[in-house]
Amino acid sequence: FRKKILENSKVKVNFIENIYDYNIDNEDILFIYSNEFFDAIGSKQFIFNNGNFNEIKISKNNNEYILIQDIAPISGELIENYSNYKFENNDVLEHSNLLLNILSDIKNLSCKKYFFTTTDYGYTSLPLKSSLRILSNHKKLNLFSKFENVDYSFAVNFELFSNFFIKNNPLIINQKKLIFNNLPNEFLKSSDKNVRKIIDLISGETFDDIGKVFLNFSFKKNE
């Protein structure tokens, strides 16, 4: 993967294992951009029952894969962290400590000025149900129907992002609004069929209006 990027890139590309491995000058303005990155970060799923969260796990019984519930040691921590929600039995919560660690790393960057923006499939309030998507060749699959050459992804909790960076006054906008708010009028008012087709494509209207749930989250730090 790295070799392919280096061969095709016309500019110098550096790969880092940790964000702190990148040498940042305090006088630099850092731009952090990602597209469909955070939805690839694995989340654990928890189900609420009788005042506590149980972790949803995969088990095998008689050669068949099944979902089971197991005691979650962090149940109390989850209830506290998401205390603005009143959970009911069978509500599903998706939570990732890895995601929290990445956000903490970004928040603790030592540079005085940086701009952060990311675009991903997500939500601004907990859906209280599973958002796990399994795709193969751009087609949705059912859980356990296929195990090779598949992509697993979770919808991104942008409410968590917003709370994490609340002091930076973050902005959340869906892709459809982002396109229509920033595209020059000459294109928006165009009657050219090809132009209209491209606008429908990039705004998400072509794909079941996915542009409404494909969100952009941005903020800047300027000290």
Map each language-model feature to its residues.
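SAM cofactor-binding core of SAM-dependent methyltransferases
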Residues: 1-25
